[in-house]
Amino acid sequence: MSTIYALSTVFGKSGVAVFRISGPDALRALELLGLDIKQPRPRFVYFARLFDEQLLIDEVLVVYFASPASFTGEDVVELHSHGSIAVLRYISEKLSTLFKPAEPGEFTRRAVLNNRMDLTKAEGIIDIINSETQEQLKQASRHLSGKLAEEYNSLRDKIIKVLSYLEAYIDFPDEEIPETVLAEIQQSIVAIQCDISRYLADGKVGEKIREGFSVVIVGKPNVGKSTLFNYLAKRDLAIVTDIPGTTRDILEVRLDCHGYPVILSDTAGIQETCDAIEKMGITRALKKATEADVIVFLRDITELHLTNVRREDVANSVIERHLDRQVAALGSREHIQIDQRHVDKLIGSSDWAQEMQLNEAGVRSKNMNYPDIEERDLNLRDILDERHEEKDRSVMCHDMMQEHDPDNGECSDDVDRRFNELFTAAKKLEIPVVKVVTKGDIAPTQLSFWQDKGYICISVYKGEGMQLLLDKIFDIISSSNIEAHIITRARHRLALENALEHLRRFNTDLPIELAAEEIKLAANHIASVTGEIKLDDVLDEIFSSFCIGK
């Protein structure tokens, strides 16, 4: 085995840097660097001066770990210097003349090969290094403590016990073995299958804790998706404008939600569009939502909610308040209109609807003190015809008049249909949907309406309702955390699935040798998780994710 070396700390300016040398010739590093340390005692710290001829390069500390009582199971020397770039380069150049630079994870790989740890403990090390939240650290600590290995070894021991009975049948065919033994073997195999099936039915919580729970924000354009995204990210990652369709692609940020890792995604607003790029963004948004662990569905509190309204005066009041808020927010930049056919559909009257729209000229004139706008409003005698001529300057409110709650199957347009399809898919896939209404500070009188419909009301501007939203997301993702989960990687899951498949193939009607082979293969798959059976391709995959020097 060759002797390897690596800088175990970050290359750059720092207070302390640590070099690690492991292998049969590790002690030769002291001579190579000209350090005046003779026959060092294991686990003692030695002070030495590093010279280049007569020039003092640095003052260092040296620790020697003798085989096999070291991290790698080999002789190991650790050299602690100051984190000067010049010093690090000098030491690296010296060590490279005699030793081989370590590959990523090579120190830990040698520890596994020398039986200093199993694969799950090695994975625990890299997970601790990569952990960003408390739950990730707790899960990684279970690996490092050996508890995960205990679970897999216990499962393998049960399979080996069954295999030993079958081997007895094979090795001693002339002996009289009670027929009840085969029945007991069958019962044991069924019990093991139940254990593995239970482990597999964990909702992939272990992988999600390690990689992050996916939380996707969806909604129409300009409902506040990017504003909420930036608020939770605590920095401006998404561009926020009042121009619909600003967000085209998916933006992601990692968050710590009360100890749980969350990957929050901002998506394109769902609307009807002729823009090819925006269409692609909408398609991606809907696809991302169906792959999420939690969907956060946003609506604007200023949306009209005329569903089930049958009184003309109530509907008129709702629309007036809505337009008044919209005009105040938009100023003279936009022209606001109502699509009469949807008012008719909900209210059942056309006479008062058009009259109400004409009366709104006064509301708009009061809020827009600009001569050109005032003149325009006073001539809104044919508001519906003008909508077609000024389509590019209109705020179309008709698509706001129908509720798009997940439990509502009615569709008034293509946008409604796409939302309903999304919520139907989410229900089938058991993806929780958190309903949120934004801009609660604009219309506080309408909060109760939305709260009664199960919405969380927030105001990013005032920071209101944000903790309630985070608590709701936390409740959902934390409820999936099963303390007994033992799968944290895809390779663990694959090993258990393969083992379960071989156990299911076991059949006492088969020749006993073939039946025993299925059990043996099942045991081997379980053993591959901890590394009892070391496969080169498995080792390569695991340690390639390690940093150099670990």
Curated annotation (Swiss-Prot):
Location in or out of the cell: Cytoplasm
Note accompanying the cofactor annotation: Binds 1 potassium ion per subunit.
TrmE-type G domain boundaries: 212-478
EC number of the protein: 3.6.-.-
Repressor in keyword set: no
Gene Ontology CC: cytoplasm
PROSITE patterns in alphabetical order: G_TRME
Entry's Gene Ontology BP terms: tRNA methylation; tRNA wobble uridine modification
Signal peptide start and end residues: none
Pfam families (alphabetical): MMR_HSR1, MnmE_helical, TrmE_N
Cofactor: K(+)
Role description: Exhibits a very high intrinsic GTPase hydrolysis rate. Involved in the addition of a carboxymethylaminomethyl (cmnm) group at the wobble position (U34) of certain tRNAs, forming tRNA-cmnm(5)s(2)U34.
HAMAP family (alphabetical): GTPase_MnmE
PANTHER family assigned: TRNA MODIFICATION GTPASE GTPBP3 (PTHR42714), TRNA MODIFICATION GTPASE GTPBP3, MITOCHONDRIAL (PTHR42714:SF2)
Protein name: tRNA modification GTPase MnmE
Taxonomic source organism: Neorickettsia sennetsu (strain ATCC VR-367 / Miyayama)
